[in-house]
Each structure stands twice: as C-alpha cells, then as structure tokens.
Amino acid sequence: MKLLYIILSLFSVLISAQIESIPKDSLTSSVDTLKVTQTSREDSLTASVDTLKKSNDIDEVTINQFSVKKLNSPISTDVYSQQFFRKNPTANMFEAIAMVNGVKPQLNCAVCNTGDIHINGLEGAYTMILIDGMPIVSSLSTVYGLSGIPNSLIDRIEVTKGPASSIYGSEAMGGVINIITKNALQAPDFSTDVMTGNQGEINLDIAKKVFDNKNFSSLLSLNYFYFGNRIDHNKDNFTDTPLQNRISVFNKWNFKRKENRQASFALRYFYEDRFGGEMQWQKENRGSDDVYGESIYTNRFEFFGIYQLPLKEKFLLQYSYNYHHQDSFYGNTSYLATQKVLFLQMNWEKQLGKHLLKSGTTLKSTFYDDNTPGTANIAGENQPMKSPIYGFYLEDEWEINDKNTLLLGYRYDYHKIHKSVHSPRVAWKFEPNPYHTLRLSFGTGFRVVNLFTEDHSALTGSREVVIADDLKPEKSLNTNLSYLMKIPIKDYFINVDVNGFYSYFNNKIVGDFDSEPDKIIYDNLAGHAISRGISADISTNWTLPIQLMFGVTYMDVYQENEGDRIQQLHAPKWSGTYNLSYQFANKFSTDLTGQFYGPMRLPTLPDDFRPEYSPWFTLMNIQLTKKFDNGFEIYGGVRNLLNFIPKNPILRPFDPFDNQVDDVASNPYGYTFDTTYGYAPMQGIRTFLGIRYQIR
C-alpha cells in the first residue's frame, strides 16, 4: 500500500508538470425570479436553471457552488449532489453524510465500528434509508450495510429532516435519506477513481457503459475497498480501526421510451469481510475464547426498479427485493442472521387544476431469522419472523395561490400483529416573495423494534441483554418548521435556512445502561421522550472564488420518567458543520471541511474513571484538487487535521471475556469489558491522495 501511495504521488507530480492549466470557464444561469445573473466555476453544475424550473422539482434560487438544492415542495428537503461530497472524498455514504448539518453518523462499537445515522439527535432506527425511493436498507442491513454503499453509485442524496411524505410510511420518525443512483443514460462512458492513504487503505471505483444505444443504456460499476493494516496508537492491544475487505458490483439499466415514460432496473451485490479485536487475533481464533475478535462476513444482493405503465394515466410501479446474510462472531458469541425483504408499490399521479393528486398501494414483506432468542417461541424453538405489511396512501398537493401551497396526506398500513396503523401528514408552504419561504409540516410515527438488528450492544456479549416486558410499538408525534431567507447583495445573495423540530414519543423503547453495569435492560418507557431543537445553515451564492457554508444545530433530546429527566446517549446539544472552498484561476481548488460537536452523554459504569460527557471536539479536513482538460483530476489532503482521538473507548481491554471481573484486588469497582463508550473515529491525523478520470 505504501508503494502504491508513492506511485500515485509521483504520477500526480508528472501530470502536473506536463499538462498546461486551462483558463477558467464559467456557467451562466439566469434566475428569473430574482432577475440575477450568476456565474459558477464548478464544472459539475451542468443542469441549467431553466431546465430545473421546467421540471418544477427544484427551488432554483438555492443553487450554489456547493451543489446543494432544495426541492420545491411544502416538505423541506435538501438535495446534495456528488460534487458536494467530493469536498471531502470518502469511501462510502456513511462517512460522507457527516457533511450535512444535523445528520450524524454514529459509531456504536469501538471494536467493529458498526454505526447508524442520527438525524436531529434521534437514533439511526428512526432514520429511513431509501435507494431510488425504495426502503432497501432496513433492520439487519443497517448494521454494516451503510458502509457498503459506495459514493460512486450515488448521483445525489435527498435529506428530509422530520415528517416526510405519506408515500414513505410511518417508520420515518426522524427523517428520510433518499439515495438516488446514477442514471445510465447520463453517466460518462467510462470513469474511475482511485484513492489511497498513508495508513494503507485503498478505495477503487470503476464504471463503464456496457451498452448505449437509442433504446437503452447500461452502466456497470465496481467498488473495491481494502484496509488490512493493524494499527494500535492508544496501546490497548485492540485495533483502532477494523480491517475491511469489501467489494460492491452495481449494474443499472435505463430505457428510453415514448412520451418520456420511466423505466429502469438495477442489481447490486455486496460482500465484506470485517474484523476488529485484539492485535494477535487470527482466523483460527474465530469464535473461540482464546483471543477476542469480532469477525463479520456479510453477503447482500439487491434488485430494484421502476416501470411506468403504458397508459394515458400516470401509473408508476416500484419494486425491490434484497437478501442479506450476516455470519458473525463477537468474541465467542455467534450471531447468524438472514433477512429477505420484498417491496412493491403502485403509484398514481394526476394534475387536476391546482391539485397534484397522488395515490398508491404498497406491500412490504420481511422475512427475518437468526440464532438469538429474538426469533424463538415460548418453547425455545426457532420461529422466523414473517411480517407482511399492506398499505395505501392518498396525497393532495394544492397550490392555493402563488404564495400558498398545502399538502394533505394520509397513509394506512395493516400489520398482522399490531393491526391498523394510521399516519396523517400535513405540510404548508408560504412564499410571500422570492426572498422568503416558510414551510411547516406535521406527522405521526409508528415503529416496531427488533433489538438484535438495531442495537449492536445486544450482540457484543459485553453485557447481558434483559427484555423486561413484551415490547409495544413506539408511537410519535413529529413537527418541523423551516424558514428560508435569500439575502440579495448586488448581483449575489446569501442563503439562510433555519429549521425548528419537535418530536414526542410514547412507548419509546430504551436500553437502560445505568441500573446494572453488566446488563442492558430494554423496556417501554413508562413516561415519554422528547427530541427538540433548532438548526441554521448559512451559505453564499456568488461569483467570487471563495464560497462559504456553515451550519449549527442545538438540540435537547431526553426521556422523562417519574419526574426524572435523562439525557439521551450520544446526542450532543451542540453540533455543526463548516465548508470553506476557494477556486484558483488555474483549475486548482482547495476545500476546508469539518464537523464540530459539543459534550454528549456517554454510557459509563458506576464509579467509572472515564468522564460521563465527551469534550468539545472538531474533525477538520483539508483538500487540494487539480483538474485537467483531458478528464483527469488529482486530489489529496489531510483528514482529522487537529489529530483528535477519543480516550479509553474500551473498558478493561485486557480482560475481554470478563474472566477476572470478580477479582476485588485488581477490579475493586467491578468493571466489565465494554465497547459502547466510543463517540468518534479512532483514526488520528492522516493523509490521502487520489486520481479521477472520466471519458464522456
């Protein structure tokens, strides 16, 4: 890996010396609503504002050099292009999404680095992850599947914080992240991206149009990620970062049809071999109690598509199927799990005057089986979970006048155990003029919990899992208020986007880490839980070579039970993002990006020597990029510039099987092995270098 890093470095120097820089070009777009002409030096911003206005999907006045847009809908939804995430290039979607204010990828284990995505402080189980609008990533697949979504297959990501459309159902309590994959018709004929770093990791992306004619196009892409370097900077005899060897193959077909009817389908296969644990662990130690290691093999297959029926009315069929198998050991604890999900949805859409009507029917069938008590009946016999959910929805987006738009939605789902589930949605957009937009949305949520797929702590064996009672479904009331202001300054403007959010939970299922140090006790909360807060984003939109984007979020997430208020774990009250970009005249650009977090409550044991709250910290990155006119692009930089590393993420790493817990002399406080304290990556300052190349 070091040799590859040196070769890439020399290659970039040679190309820089031989290829002449290109004069800066610009892309001029007219915004009629503001009567402003603006120029962008970003080559990636190829879609004209006129085209976007015709589609009526994008609020064009929010376009800037960060390639961030807002959907022109009563529901506040931000759209982030691939160019936005290239400001800090990463290997997968899980790491990339940290650049979005109010969205936090949370590492839940200091050993294997499983994680979930928090929106506005709510745990990852409350975030609905969609691919091309379909719930392909759920339950078991969220444990390690998020790191298996390579950025190379992503065209853009749509983020909705708070109540989303009734189309998405009742489980999207915290918000929705919709990953839109690349369109084979519009993709380059060939593209590749190779990135490596000084710690030995390598990420390879290759994409090629294998078919391209007047009727259809097919895009075949390969992503390979490898990290095999055992690093232990904090000297606790555990790997700081898990070793990973994964591959993802993606194939998408897009068809050209009469009257621009939609038709596409895609397939993806994903495999990963992941290990984290003691430095001396080897494959022969897998599943034994000789040396502690967490070894996970993941196999996953996805098939999904869209087909618009050849009818006068607009009927759109969405379909997907995914198979996910996990073969894992956490120390000597085996976890074997299989999940199969079938999803079908027929959508109807029609414009009647000022009303955009939508309706549809849905079937989501989930099969889940594992070797834990979660799929055992009262007699202790294996009983896989089979949960078909049938539903339908109605939605009316009513443009009352030029200033007011009202969205009314309702969804009904039938669950075989919990029966009828009703999910109303209301959203209102008020735009008195092009400079001010107010959005208000409200909805309810309903969610059934699977502890063994949603909470990694239930699997590690570091604590005994206790389920206190029959768990009831969680219910919530959610509301979101958004205000977008565009401040004109001569021929430019500044965007200010402020969002307030509030969620109230009944029957919230919580894990009690505090009552007994060797147990996690799960039960429905007798009281209630609340997530509330406010966030603000400020970004520039001008022709100057410097661009700024800054976001900050304040939130208060807690549960209240019998008069006691307990702050939620891993939910900092203050957090934010920053992005400073500068475009030089000779096709050089630099990006300073990062996130900052305030103190967050952490799972500690009684008399724990570690602080109950994390310190303030920031993860800062810097990148330098050089573009050439022949399709080459070279980039490199430094991650975690301030070298922040959490202290003591693992408790008693020298006794991972708790063989000496009862030794009062060496363990007077009764500490047990625990991996849940980690709150940030263990990788310190490090460098990266990459090369991109594409042929249109």
Regions found by a protein language model. Give the residues of each.
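Short acidic/polar hinge/loop motifs at secondary-structure boundaries
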Residues: 118, 134-161, 249, 468
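Short, acidic, small-residue-rich periplasmic hinge/interaction motif at the N-terminus
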Residues: 19-86, 124
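Flexible loop and strand-edge segments within Gram-negative outer membrane beta-barrel domains
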Residues: 19, 227-248, 256-315, 321-340, ...
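Membrane-embedded beta-barrel scaffold of Gram-negative outer-membrane proteins
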Residues: 314-328, 431, 439, 472-524, ...
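N-terminal periplasmic accessory domains that precede
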Residues: 60, 93-96, 115-118, 130, ...
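Gram-negative outer-membrane beta-barrel transporters
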Residues: 399-403, 501-504, 524-604, 692
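C-terminal beta-signal and adjacent terminal beta-strands/loops
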Residues: 548, 596-601, 626-696
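Extracytoplasmic beta-strand/coil segments of soluble accessory domains associated
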Residues: 94-135
